[in-house]
């Protein structure tokens, strides 16, 4: 079973991915993990990706796609995979189709977890970090015992600049604009499966299970 998982930041992709890989025994493959592994293994493509990342530049599509190809060719993907964070563009999606055909594979489902962006703002702005130990909290979903204070070491919690409302809203706008052409692409291909993410985690996952069945 070969899956692509799509959704805005904060839509709950990570939570659903964790359940899918446990229940269906397929590897969770994220772009970040692929880059880190290729760099750690010092593969030629990994070293090329690192040269761009060290300069703060975006890794070109051809390098990213090469790393994806290497990862999907590994033995643990023989019975399927869950791609998360790739593809991000129609160009990447086209390239993914080609490389999967080369590997005698094809996408079974593109699972899109749809969430109202306005509902994501409090999720994404509520995160607080301990600058000392790195512990993560959320003012609504995972608050510390004492407001604004780390449970572990008593440090004052901080909000990352990335989590401030103006930045979050801007990031969501960009993500919505980038995602729509990809959603349209997979809808035309017949792969797209839209799930309502504005519900409790277990309700969303029940829909995932109904979709995937005993595959």
UniProtKB/Swiss-Prot annotation:
Keyword Metal-binding (UniProt): yes
Binding locations of Zn(2+): 130, 133, 150, 153
PROSITE patterns to which the protein is assigned, alphabetical: ADENYLATE_KINASE (PS00113)
Primary subcellular site in the record, as a coarse category: cytoplasm
EC number: 2.7.4.3
Top EC group: transferase
Positions annotated to bind ATP: 10-15, 127, 136-137, 199
Pathway the protein contributes to: Purine metabolism; AMP biosynthesis via salvage pathway; AMP from ADP: step 1/1
GO BP terms in the entry: AMP salvage
One of the record's GO molecular function terms: zinc ion binding
Region (NMP): 30-59
Annotated segments matching region LID: 126-163
Record-stated family: Belongs to the adenylate kinase family.
UniProt name for this protein: Adenylate kinase
Name of the gene encoding the protein in the UniProt record: adk
């Amino acid at each position: 079973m070969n899956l692509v998982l799509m959704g805005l930041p904060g839509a709950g992709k990570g939570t659903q991915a964790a359940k899918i890989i446990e229940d269906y025994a397929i590897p969770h493959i994220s772009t970040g993990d692929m880059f880190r592994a290729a760099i750690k293994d010092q593969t030629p493509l990994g070293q090329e990706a690192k040269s761009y990342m060290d300069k703060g530049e975006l890794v070109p599509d051809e390098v990213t796609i090469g790393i994806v190809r290497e990862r999907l060719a590994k033995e643990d993907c023989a019975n399927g995979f869950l791609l998360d964070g790739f593809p991000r563009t129609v160009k990447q999606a086209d390239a993914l189709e080609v490389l999967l055909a080369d590997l005698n594979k094809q996408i079974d489902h593109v699972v899109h977890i749809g969430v109202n962006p306005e509902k994501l703002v409090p999720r994404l702005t509520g995160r607080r970090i301990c600058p000392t130990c790195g512990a993560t909290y959320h003012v609504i979903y995972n608050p510390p015992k004492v407001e604004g204070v780390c449970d572990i070491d008593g440090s004052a919690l901080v909000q990352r600049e990335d989590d401030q409302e103006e930045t979050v809203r801007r990031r969501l706008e960009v993500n919505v604009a980038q995602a729509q052409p990809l959603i349209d692409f997979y809808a035309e291909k017949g792969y797209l499966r839209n799930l309502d993410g504005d519900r409790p985690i277990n309700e969303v996952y029940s829909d995932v299970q109904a979709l995937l069945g005993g595959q």
